[in-house]
């Protein structure tokens, strides 16, 4: 069974939330690609739509959006995801992973594209319950 750490970013709040996805929910993500919009109910965010933006595998190799399939491959890179050249025009062969989610992916990055009725904090149980105002001491 696959287990993923999904990092869901909320552009409105400027916050990111880490969610552990296991078993049946994780299997729903296998085969999806970078750029696919997924129902947020898979992560426990009912009513939300989430777009997959990237991720990495257990060895730390990043998912590259323009490499098809779930495989690892050494490609010649000049710029882009997974490589920053030190000098202009420098190219280097780097190991990257394809854009498809596979069972050996560890982390999936995503962002919210459609919001639900409840806040993400409330759905994940991070919102503190509202406290009743303290009564003034009687004199």
From Swiss-Prot:
For this chain, one GO molecular function annotation is: structural constituent of ribosome
One Pfam family here:
Ribosomal_S6e
For this protein, the record's InterPro entries field holds:
Ribosomal_eS6 (IPR001377), Ribosomal_eS6_arc (IPR020924), Ribosomal_eS6_CS (IPR018282)
Q: Which keywords, in A-to-Z order, does the entry hold?
A: Ribonucleoprotein, Ribosomal protein
Q: Which residues form a coiled coil?
A: none
Per its UniProt entry, which superkingdom is the organism in?
Answer: Archaea
- Which GO biological process annotations does it have? translation
Which Gene Ontology CC terms are recorded?
ribonucleoprotein complex; ribosome
Q: Which NCBIfam families match?
A: PRK04290.1-3
Name the protein family: Belongs to the eukaryotic ribosomal protein eS6 family.
Protein name (Swiss-Prot/TrEMBL): Small ribosomal subunit protein eS6
Which source organism? Answer: Methanosarcina barkeri (strain Fusaro / DSM 804)
Q: Which gene encodes it?
A: rps6e
């Amino acid at each position: 069974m696959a287990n993923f750490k999904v990092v869901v970013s909320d552009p409105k709040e400027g916050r990111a939330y880490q969610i552990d996805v296991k078993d049946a929910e994780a299997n729903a993500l296998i085969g999806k690609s970078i750029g696919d919009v997924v129902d947020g109910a898979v992560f426990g965010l009912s009513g939300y739509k989430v777009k997959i933006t990237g991720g990495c595998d257990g060895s730390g190799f990043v998912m590259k959006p323009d490499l098809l399939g779930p495989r690892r491959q050494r490609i010649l890179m000049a710029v882009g995801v997974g490589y920053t050249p030190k000098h202009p025009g420098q190219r280097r062969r780097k190991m990257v992973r394809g854009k498809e989610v596979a069972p050996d992916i560890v982390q999936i990055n995503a962002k919210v594209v459609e919001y639900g009725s409840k806040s993400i904090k409330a759905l994940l149980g991070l919102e503190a319950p509202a406290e009743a105002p303290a009564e003034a001491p009687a004199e």
